[in-house]
Amino acid sequence: MEWPALTERFLLYLAAECGLSVNYRESVRRSLARFTEWCRSRELSPQHITEPLLAEYRRLLHEEGLALSSCRIAMVHLRRFFRYLNSRAVIEQNPAALVKGGAVRRAIPETLAAESVAKMLDATDADDIPYGARDRAILEMLYGSGLRVSELVRLRADQISWEEKFLRITGKGGKTRYVPMGTMAAKALQNYVQQARHVLAREGHRVPELFLSNRGEPLTRERIRQIIRKRAASAGLNEHVYPHIMRHSFATHLLENGADLRVIQDMLGHADLATTQIYTHVEAKRLVGLHRNFHPRGRKRD
């Protein structure tokens, strides 16, 4: 049985046998939709799911910037879902039985040095049509505008103001914000739209999303992740590079260069300033390192 059918049976079970509310079931539906999209992108059936794969998925949620509480909720939903599949003999063992939702702690965000970002961008040839142009635009938008990967895959032409160089983004909770595009990001996106997108689009198949796969379908979050990993490797970067690290780098580099924290909050679409303030810890850690390395009283004595 395929993922969609299993999801619907589970939701029916939650309603009919458990008596759970509509709101709770909708929350479960969203969690399972995200998880099953990831499974389908990797051609994983329910029988393929293991405890290490679920731990990998939990790390992915964290890397994509999901709040710790949301990660916990998602893993609670998955534990319940796989317990149900096991009870119905769809799977022989429950791979989620020992997976904990709260194992990922809130840490200082990982970032790339500006030089590493530049190296990856320079190694992605925008004149290589269509994939170089597409991938360069993806990298420029994630780093130049600080988009979430979920916002990037949904980006449409009607959200772009070319003249004023800004994007109209609908983020978490349906909130709209306006995000500036840097000159290089706007140039890369325009190059992709004008020179490459029509090569990827399928004739007679209208797709509103801007970023397309080789089959003319909208790129998924997992495919964006694969593209970024590939481009980082091609640039010779040894760091673990993933979509959300570009957003972290966007915010951190703005802060390092003197941007106001509340302006960064607005551009990131954070409802709470406290969420943005974690980037001040990145800057503080950097300054401590500089002091330790260069100040006469900061270095350890032999």
Cite the ranges covered by each PLM segment.
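Conserved catalytic core of the tyrosine transesterase superfamily
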Residues: 1-302
